[in-house]
Amino acid sequence: MQITTNIASIRTHIPQGVTLVCVSKFHPMEAIMEAYECGERDFGESRVQELLPKYEALPKDIRWHFIGHLQTNKVKQIVPFVHMIHSVDSVRLLETINREAEKIQRRVKVLLEVHVAKEETKSGFSPEEFLSLASSPNSLIASSPNSLNEASYPWVEICGVMGMATNTDDESEWRRCFRAIASLASHLSPLASSPNSLIASSPIAYSSPSERPQISMGMSDDYLVAIEEGSTMVRIGSTIFGFRTSKL
């Protein structure tokens, strides 16, 4: 019942319009089902080899979010069912997702991962790389279409950005990171017409029912600050499921 209690507590702090992604990586299916019985449907996993058996065994109305580093050779295993890939950190990965999605004729939702934290170990486009793609599409190599728009990647639905704050207890540093992520998200523009249109209104365009980019930021320690700074999607694990003592 602890998971039920934890979710109820967290829900009191999450406003309408912010999606709670329950980060279930390294946690057993029984724990996921307890959260599911509370009404949760969005779950986050970071390893393909762990996600696949969970997808096969658990209810099919679960929306699976892939939040970890994704190797290009594993993309084809999750594109048939994944709800959203949060961790697109390179044009090469975006190209692979588009190619595999086209094979099965299924558009895949993604977020572009941006790196604003102080740790060099974190992945993602640097702010400079992100803004370069947004503002200078003509400088990109024509033989390998790298401008992040619907015309280049018709089978990828760019929904927004994802990022992480520096691993610190300093709230001011959290805010710096979250404001930087939200600022980068503001450089995304909605599609010119329908979500299926191949004409984008900017080099980096997103397709979102709410006509605003999704901003996936905030975890167990800092999600309240992230929400204050504009997060539309928080990824919470240990505060729901407890700390993981060992990997599955």
Task: Label each residue range with its predicted role.
Residues T232-M233:
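Divalent-metal-activated hydrolytic enzyme cores
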Residues M1-A142, N146-A192, Y206-D221, E229, ...:
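Conserved alpha/beta-domain cores
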Residues S197, I204-S207:
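Intrinsically disordered, low-complexity Ser/Thr- and acidic-rich flexible linkers and loops
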